[in-house]
Amino acid sequence: MQDAPQEEDVPDVSALFPEAPPECHRTLDMVLRAGLKASFRLLPQARPRLEEIAQACDCEVDAIAQIALYKGKTSKKPYLVIASGKRTMKERALAAAIGEVLQRSNDEATMQLTGFAPGMIPPLGLTMRLPVLMDANLNRFAQIWCHAGTPNAFIRVSTALLARAISARSIKPDL
């Protein structure tokens, strides 16, 4: 296992990704601190559809991670759920994975717990560390595209290395 980069070893985000808006810097910085290699893409559309993202990033729609915040219905414990493309995570699959029914968090809770609005949550750079449930279908891809902190900014990272960096638990979404 590789040691995390030291402060002086982490490149300057704005120098490495000059096209990245400031809202993406925290995410990109955490990607670099996790030792991940990433590609960055800023799309011209303000809120691109999945098909537009796939075309611009030259990938399948299912290689785009859709990230949302859920909470336990009883415990209220928050979970970051990463789904593959247009797929949705079935409630019974989530419940089977953690032993509790989950419900999607509202916009205010999402913003408070992640630091990002719904629909643009990145996998890294959140305001707090959260348990992560990741769609096993994403493992079909060596690399996936994720939001980088704005609706039109994306990073491409290694699926396996990202899963390890965020301690994601792989689950089958359609039990």
Segments (PLM) and residue ranges:
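Extended, low-hydrophobicity, polar/charged segments
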Residues: 2-175
